[in-house]
UniProtKB/Swiss-Prot annotation:
This is Aspartate aminotransferase, mitochondrial. In eukaryotes there are cytoplasmic, mitochondrial and chloroplastic isozymes. The modification N6-(pyridoxal phosphate)lysine is found at K272. Its EC number is 2.6.1.1, 2.6.1.7. Gene3D superfamilies: Aspartate Aminotransferase, domain 1, Type I PLP-dependent aspartate aminotransferase-like (Major domain). It is found in: Mitochondrion matrix. GO terms for biological process: 2-oxoglutarate metabolic process; aspartate catabolic process; aspartate metabolic process; biosynthetic process; glutamate metabolic process.
Length: 423
């Protein structure tokens, strides 16, 4: 009897633990799916092939395949360190010099909206955080519609950002997989049918994931139909300067819409064009009817931000602000960002040239027609799978590659592999 009682006492904690697990507050929580891009990176890391290529990651690499910190960023960091600045909280709306410089960069120094002060810009946590602030603002104050129309396809994070803010997602045609180019006719048809006073999201430049941008004449037609339908245009500008190498050219569409009197909101990121990926520097801007309205909007944006994260991070904003507001650093940045854009453009040209040398009979012109970091190659999922298994070349299943991950030393290998799986 004593032995039995002893065993019962010993087993009691185990039964209690099992019961606790079964009745856990979180027992209903299912394992979520892995991030598709991070999954590509993990598989790449496990590969032992010396020729392996990771074309999934959305970060710039130099021609040696190494991560790159801009010289102007290094100089700005040194200047900040020398000043021995404090680590106090930033204001809720962010670093004032940074937000003003961000607005000037996006809108242009001669912009009527900028010069008249009929805008408000708040600092956000890079592009994602700025988009989320914007989404929450629209959810609370845009009373006309809950619908946000995204191009098909769009950046994968757009859907959860707007959905989790309580908005509803719709789509308009954008990319034609048959031609690997813009479905302009489809886009115009769909946008012309969007209910009035809805929200339409537009990629200002270097559309992610396709790399397909409208031409300026097409942007004019798009602006015309957006204005006719009385839509609110939400511009996502994550690549200003990084697309064409020209900050003004990359902001042309945004500025044209504003000049046409279209209501616009904007999210910016400095992850790509300044290489400040981990610093999380970004901004959200609302173009208003006058300066008084801008003050009211700013007051509500600060009320929204306060329970989200209270104050934005300091370091990235200081770096970006110093670069944008210091003539010598700004000049150096413009040269460096053009250098990054030019290298990507060169890799596109070299890839097509090497495909021709391989004897490929396919038309690869879309690779050079597209712009920015990403390229929709037109490769099918089974071809992508072969590239991974046979050549250790990693990319997302939709055939999107980060051209920034291609270098002079391996562009020939990539072309050879693509030819082998497409011939």
């Amino acid at each position: 009897m004593a032995l039995l009682q002893s065993r019962l006492l010993l087993s009691a904690p185990r039964r209690a633990a099992a019961t606790a697990r079964a009745s856990s507050w979180w027992s209903h929580v299912e394992m979520g799916p892995p991030d598709p891009i991070l999954g590509v990176t993990e598989a790449f890391k496990r590969d032992t092939n010396s020729k392996k290529m990771n074309l999934g990651v959305g970060a710039y690499r130099d021609d040696n395949g190494k991560s790159y910190v801009l010289n102007c960023v290094r100089k700005a960091e040194a200047m900040i360190a020398a000043k021995k600045m404090d680590k106090e909280y930033l204001p809720i709306a962010g670093l004032a010099d940074f937000t003003r410089a961000s607005a000037e960069l996006a809108l242009g120094e001669n912009s009527e909206a900028f010069k008249s002060g009929r805008y408000v810009t708040v600092q956000g946590i890079s592009g994602t955080g700025s988009l989320r602030v914007g989404a929450n603002f629209l959810q609370r104050f845009f009373k006309f519609s809950r619908d946000v129309y995204l191009p098909k396809p769009s950046w994968g994070n757009h859907t959860p950002i707007f959905r989790d803010a309580g908005l509803q997602l719709q789509a308009y045609r954008y990319y034609d997989p048959k031609t690997c180019s813009l479905d302009f006719t489809g886009a115009m048809e769909d946008i012309s049918k969007i209910p009035e006073k809805s929200i339409i999201l537009l990629h200002a430049c270097a559309h992610n994931p396709t790399g397909v941008d409208p031409r300026q004449e097409q942007w004019k037609e798009l602006a015309s139909v957006v204005k006719k339908r009385n839509l609110l245009a939400y511009f996502d500008m994550a690549y200003q300067g990084f697309a064409s190498g020209d900050i003004n050219r990359d902001a042309w569409a945004l500025r044209h819409f504003i000049e046409q009197g279209i209501d616009v909101v904007l999210s910016q990121s400095y992850a790509k064009n300044m290489g400040l990926y981990g610093e999380r520097a970004g901004a959200f801007t609302v173009i208003c009817r006058d300066a008084e309205e801008a003050k009211r909007v700013e007051s509500q944006l600060k009320i929204l931000i306060r329970p989200m994260y209270s104050n934005p991070p300091m370091n990235g904003a200081r770096i970006a602000s110093l670069i944008l507001n210091t003539p010598e650093l700004r000049k150096e940045w413009l040269v460096e960002v053009k250098g990054m854009a030019d290298r990507i453009i060169s890799m596109r040209t070299q890839l097509v040239s090497n495909l021709k040398k391989e004897g490929s009979s396919h038309n690869w012109q879309h690779i050079t027609d597209q712009i920015g970091m990403f390229c929709f190659t037109g490769l099918k999922p089974e071809q992508v799978e072969r590239l991974t298994k046979e050549f250790s070349i990693y990319m997302t299943k939709d055939g999107r590659i980060s051209v920034a991950g291609v270098a002079s030393s391996n562009v020939g290998y990539l072309a050879h592999a693509i030819h082998q799986v497409t011939k």
